[in-house]
Amino acid sequence: MKSLKIKKGDRVKVIAGNDKGAIGEVLSVDPARERVVVEGVNIRKHHRRDMPTPQGGTTKGGIISSEAPIHVSNVQLVTKIDGKDVVTRVGYRRVDVTKRRPDGSEYAAQRSVRYLKKEEAK
């Protein structure tokens, strides 16, 4: 399974497709299919019928709109710099951290940390 640089909660801009130029928050990520669901983008309508519930009632049917997944290559990360939305890329760097063992002793280790390249250039 491929590791994606886009994570849930990121602000992204759609760079291809019918919703090109739209900016929204990532609601979910599917790394196996390399797809992301972006808030307010790729809206699809689902026709649902009235369904009985186990409690004896019914859930109301109708036409329900929801976001459909889009391929991760069609989105790019967005960050706010000086109040403007700026598209950026993602980089990873190694950071020294101190970890603690269950017996209380500490040791030095490294952790990979994600950062936005445009924010780094500032």
Swiss-Prot record:
One of two assembly initiator proteins, it binds directly to the 5'-end of the 23S rRNA, where it nucleates assembly of the 50S subunit. One of the proteins that surrounds the polypeptide exit tunnel on the outside of the subunit. Part of the 50S ribosomal subunit. The gene is rplX. Keywords: Ribonucleoprotein, Ribosomal protein, RNA-binding, rRNA-binding. This is Large ribosomal subunit protein uL24. SUPFAM superfamilies: Translation proteins SH3-like domain. InterPro entries: KOW (IPR005824), Rib_uL2_dom2 (IPR014722), Ribosomal_uL24 (IPR003256), Ribosomal_uL24_CS (IPR005825), Ribosomal_uL24_KOW (IPR041988), Translation_prot_SH3-like_sf (IPR008991). One of its GO terms (biological process) is translation. Residues 43-64 are annotated as: Disordered. The keyword Magnesium does not apply.
